[in-house]
């Protein structure tokens, strides 16, 4: 138990220590200031901008920024879709893997361009090396960079005033890839290789075991994809077992690096925001609220798993119970990681929009599974994905400012800018897209007989498997309750739709809000006379409960039919 506390403390300290230097670095990159990596990144950026031409030089309005973002995503979608359909005739395919069916290729292409990485296929048998490297790995970089661009555009809109532009998408995209994601990923990949993660394009090995049977050992360019999988909060595994596979996550060191990588950029953006708007206290307040939410989720999930079998009452179980004091739920977990390493990793993964797992979520106790759902259901704002976590949290921040100001009889304002009705419309649009999307698609799937046939469990747990799939898809997480066989035409198409709506619907609202904020006057006098101090402890509490009440209650009835009912059924066995 002491070792678990030490690991947790080390993890939190590491994230806190990374936040300021990485946040400052991101600030310098997007403010065109000198950085230590200019010598490496600038040549790539020059070639990239030369290819784009004039479109990369002019500042863009919110509408132009969003149009460029969508145009890029459409091109990326077509590119990935074609490769997945034709991978059977493309090179670097030693296993002779055939092209995907159109519904599955559609689902996979949407999944990777939206930074979801939902996988209705098994990586080692469903995708060639060529597709892994040129289609999926590339999207791991650029889809993460797209989320980062949106967050930076939003931060600019708060810092700037009385102007119409929020930056240039194409320029921001290049900076996100060449200055931030690519250099850090290279370092992480090298560490992974030294830890035993393979990086090759060899055919799978056929070996004879001591038992006299033949075993197939997969190979591939794993280290390079694994690095950006975590750093870009993508989560799509090279193997079906994801980070439970010893080739993806062979040691405790790689497990720790993956967890830190998942939170690194999202945590740093809180400091970037504070530094950019000239109020670092505001950034640390955001960091603090995120951290408290994370700790609560981790504690509940860990306790649920450490005592996950206490409800069993047979004599044999009672004999063991009397010896160890409690029964931990080790089903679906790697013995080399144990319960705490598993719950810590999966709390990190579901809090961010990563979706990578080092244990089987479907085997978790119902309450632990519910916490994984809640981490996503509140909008992935517990640090969250690269960029997406920050702009999701900012929507709740705006709502808390609006509610708090009205409660004390003041006109709502944030950092000297008046918050008006139009701003709140975009805020609520962003916050309501997810629950509407999830509840509609889950309700439809729950009454379709063909979907029932894809479930390995019935009743409340079967409903939880369906609910989890659409929560994960709409929030661009990508993790799953594996009891749902997702490779059907209906699930491939509807989950793809939920991913598109959850990603681009929210981005549209965020960028439109940014377009509104950037035009406003910034009155420091207004900020000073306002009684609502947005850096105070009381405001932090207001934001905390706004997230829980608005984010959590919208999905609570569905949770009642799924994991809560599932837990009650177990308690009365």
UniProtKB/Swiss-Prot annotation:
It is a multi-pass membrane protein. GO terms for cellular component: plasma membrane. It is found in: Cell inner membrane. Coiled coil: none annotated. One of its GO terms (molecular function) is P-type potassium transmembrane transporter activity. Its main location: membrane. It holds the Pfam family KdpA. The chain crosses the membrane at residues 6-26, 66-86, 135-155, 177-197, 257-277, 283-303, 382-402, 428-448, 493-513, 537-557. Keywords: Cell inner membrane, Cell membrane, Ion transport, Membrane, Potassium, Potassium transport, Transmembrane, Transmembrane helix, Transport. Signal peptide: none annotated. The system is composed of three essential subunits: KdpA, KdpB and KdpC. Part of the high-affinity ATP-driven potassium transport (or Kdp) system, which catalyzes the hydrolysis of ATP coupled with the electrogenic transport of potassium into the cytoplasm. This subunit binds the periplasmic potassium ions and delivers the ions to the membrane domain of KdpB through an intramembrane tunnel. Belongs to the KdpA family. HAMAP family: KdpA. This is Potassium-transporting ATPase potassium-binding subunit. It comes from Francisella tularensis subsp. holarctica (strain LVS). The gene is kdpA.
């Amino acid at each position: 138990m002491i070792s678990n506390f030490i690991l947790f403390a080390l993890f939190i300290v590491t994230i806190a220590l990374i936040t300021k230097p990485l946040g400052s670095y991101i600030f310098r990159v997007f403010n065109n200031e000198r950085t230590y990596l200019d010598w490496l990144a600038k040549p790539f950026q020059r070639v990239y901008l030369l290819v784009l031409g004039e479109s990369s030089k002019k500042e863009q309005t919110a509408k132009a920024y969003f149009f460029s973002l969508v145009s890029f995503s459409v091109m990326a979608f077509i590119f990935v879709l074609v490769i997945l359909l034709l991978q059977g005739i493309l090179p670097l395919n030693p296993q002779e893997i055939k092209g995907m069916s159109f519904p599955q290729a559609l689902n996979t292409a949407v999944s990777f361009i939206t930074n979801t990485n939902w996988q209705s296929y098994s990586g080692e048998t469903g995708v060639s090396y060529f597709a892994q490297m040129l289609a999926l790995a590339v999207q791991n970089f650029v889809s993460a960079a797209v989320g980062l661009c949106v967050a930076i555009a939003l931060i600019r809109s708060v810092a700037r005033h009385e102007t119409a532009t929020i930056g240039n998408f194409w320029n921001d995209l290049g900076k996100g890839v060449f200055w931030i994601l690519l250099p850090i990923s290279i370092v992480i990949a090298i560490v992974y290789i030294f830890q035993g993660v393979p990086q090759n394009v060899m055919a799978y090995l056929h070996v004879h075991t001591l038992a006299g049977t033949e075993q197939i050992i997969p190979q591939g360019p794993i280290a390079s994809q694994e690095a950006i999988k975590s750093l870009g909060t993508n989560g799509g595994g090279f193997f079906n077992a994801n980070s439970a596979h010893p080739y993806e996550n062979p040691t405790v060191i790689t497990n720790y690096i993956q967890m830190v990588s998942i939170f690194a950029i999202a945590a740093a953006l809180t400091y970037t925001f504070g530094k950019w708007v000239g109020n670092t206290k505001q950034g640390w307040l955001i960091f603090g609220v995120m951290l408290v939410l994370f700790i609560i989720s981790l504690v509940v999930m860990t306790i649920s798993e450490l005592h996950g079998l206490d409800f069993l009452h047979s004599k044999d179980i009672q004999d063991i119970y009397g010896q160890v004091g409690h029964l931990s739920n080790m089903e679906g977990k790697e013995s080399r990681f144990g319960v705490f390493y598993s719950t810590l990793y999966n709390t990190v993964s579901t809090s961010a929009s990563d979706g990578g797992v080092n244990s089987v979520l479907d085997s978790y106790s119902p309450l632990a599974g519910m916490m994984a759902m809640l981490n996503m259901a509140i909008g992935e704002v517990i640090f969250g994905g690269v960029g997406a976590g920050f702009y999701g949290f900012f929507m709740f921040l705006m709502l808390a400012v609006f509610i708090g100001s009205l409660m004390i009889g003041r006109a709502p304002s944030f950092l000297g800018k008046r918050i008006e009705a139009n701003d709140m419309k975009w805020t609520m649009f962003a916050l309501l897209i997810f629950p509407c999307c999830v509840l509609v698609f889950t309700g439809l799937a729950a009454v379709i007989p063909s979907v029932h046939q894809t479930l390995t469990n019935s009743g409340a747990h079967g409903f939880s498997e369906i609910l989890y799939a659409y929560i994960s898809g709409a929030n661009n997480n990508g993790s799953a309750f594996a009891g749902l066989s997702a490779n059907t035409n209906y699930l491939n198409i509807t989950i793809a739709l939920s991913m598109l709506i959850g990603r681009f619907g929210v981005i549209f609202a965020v960028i439109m809000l940014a377009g509104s904020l950037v035009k406003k006057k910034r009155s420091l006098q207004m900020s000073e006379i306002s009684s609502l101090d947005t850096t105070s402890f009381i405001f932090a509490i207001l934001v905390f409960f706004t997230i829980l009440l608005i984010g959590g209650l919208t999905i609570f009835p569905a949770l009642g039919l799924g994991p809560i009912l599932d837990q009650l059924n177990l308690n009365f066995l």
